[in-house]
């Protein structure tokens, strides 16, 4: 089971927090659709901003979006213009959705940007960087070896696995290649495993990238 499901999903409530922190009875399906729209807008607008995570918190009238990134200045922009532009796109999309669903409720939207200080511990940032390098036509094996070498220098990471799939280096037949170091106990629920995935758009088609980082085991603190 550990190899068939995303590592962060199977560990929700154990050692991984929920990415959306809210609960409503009647409006859940509408708010879930809004959350998907918010994430889509962020991922499209900030593709190269080194985003580690996007968390969403809600009350009945307020929406708070927390973006963790290693390039906060790129998101905020000069005099806050970047973050205001991002907020305007989200507001426009949410209002269109609510109009379509006939929901007439006022709301406020707040965006907080948190700086990610250590990019080498973020699977999402690493997968985005691999995708960027592959799009720049750097050979995938060179990218993977360099990434594994950089990860191996970090003592906090006990194991790592990289996987790329698609028409690698323009090959006629798509294939999957992987590279790993250390341990990767996917079936151990107390294992702290960070997972990230990205897609590189090349002239030969899409190349999928997956990254697993094992950071040791998490035990409950004794009172």
Where are these regions (language model features)?
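RNA-contacting regions in translation and RNA-metabolism proteins
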Residues: 1-223
């Amino acid at each position: 089971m550990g190899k068939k499901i995303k590592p962060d999903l199977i560990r929700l409530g154990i050692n991984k927090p929920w990415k959306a922190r809210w609960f409503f009875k009647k409006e859940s399906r509408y708010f879930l659709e809004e959350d998907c729209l918010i994430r889509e807008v962020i991922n499209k607008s900030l593709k190269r901003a080194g985003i580690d995570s996007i968390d969403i918190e809600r009350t009945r009238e307020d929406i708070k979006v927390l973006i963790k990134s290693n390039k906060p200045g790129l998101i905020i922009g000069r005099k806050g213009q970047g973050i205001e532009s991002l907020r305007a796109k989200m507001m426009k999309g949410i209002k269109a959705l609510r109009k379509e669903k006939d929901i007439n409720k006022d709301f406020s939207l707040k965006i907080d940007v948190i700086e990610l200080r250590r990019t080498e511990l973020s699977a999402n940032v690493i997968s985005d960087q691999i995708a960027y390098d592959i799009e720049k036509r750097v050979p995938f094996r060179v990218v993977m070896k360099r990434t594994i070498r950089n990860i191996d220098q970090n003592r906090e990471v006990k194991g790592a696995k990289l996987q790329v799939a698609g028409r690698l280096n323009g090959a006629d037949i798509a294939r999957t290649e992987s590279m790993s170091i250390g341990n990767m106990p996917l079936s151990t629920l107390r294992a702290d495993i960070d997972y990230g995935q990205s897609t590189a758009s090349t002239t030969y088609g899409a190349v999928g990238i997956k990254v697993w980082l094992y950071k040791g085991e998490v035990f409950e603190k004794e009172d």
